[in-house]
A protein has these predicted regions:
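A generic structural signal for secondary-structure junctions
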Residues: 16-19, 28, 47-50, 83-84, ...
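Generic structural signal for small/hydrophobic residues in well-ordered secondary structure
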Residues: 7-8, 42, 79, 104, ...
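Alpha-helix/helix-capping structural signal
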Residues: 9-10, 37-40, 74, 117
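Short secondary-structure capping/turn micro-motifs that flank functional sites
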Residues: 62, 95, 119-121
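Active-site neighborhoods of divalent-metal-dependent phosphate/nucleic-acid chemistry enzymes
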Residues: 67-114
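Short, well-structured N-terminal submotif of metal-dependent ribonuclease cores
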Residues: 1-35, 44-61, 136
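Acidic, PIN/NYN-like endoribonuclease modules and their adjacent C-terminal/linker elements
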Residues: 1-3, 101, 105-136
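Nucleotide phosphate-binding site architecture
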Residues: 11-12, 40-43, 69, 120
Length: 136
């Protein structure tokens, strides 16, 4: 099975078992993984939203079945390149979206997202493969 990276929104939908049918179909047969950024964002949500033991347990259980792409020097270098090129184009990108894109591009993995517009520049200018569509 080939790997596909879930952005934080898709990870959230997957965690709650609420993936849109078209995305669920597109992900069938793939092994899902997330980036270190999504781990951080999910932890932030857990704290800010006051998740109780049940919801925290669901997250821990879900995480056992989803791999995590870690930070490394190649990802850091790619992030710097992506940020610089986007700035030169006059379209600076959010830092966390750039980290997620960098992880995907370094490992040549597609990104599942419901927010195509957030990653469209990375697809157009950097060759990031996107799976998904707009949020339902």
């Amino acid at each position: 099975m080939s790997l596909v990276v879930l952005d934080t929104d898709v990870a959230s939908f997957s965690l709650r078992n609420r993936l849109p049918d078209r995305l669920r179909a597109a992900l069938a047969g793939h092994t899902m993984c997330i980036t270190f950024v999504t781990v951080g964002e999910l932890m932030k949500w857990r704290v800010l939203r006051g998740w109780g033991p049940s919801r925290t347990g669901e997250l821990a259980s879900w995480r056992q079945h989803v791999g995590v792409l870690a930070y490394d020097e190649a990802v850091a270098e790619k992030w710097g390149q992506l940020q610089a090129r986007a700035q030169r184009r006059g379209r600076p990108r959010p830092q966390n979206d750039t980290w997620i894109a960098a992880c995907c591009l370094v490992d040549d993995l597609p990104l599942a997202t419901l927010n195509i517009k957030d990653f469209a520049d990375f697809a157009e200018y950097e060759g990031l493969t996107l799976i998904g569509g707009q949020e339902p």
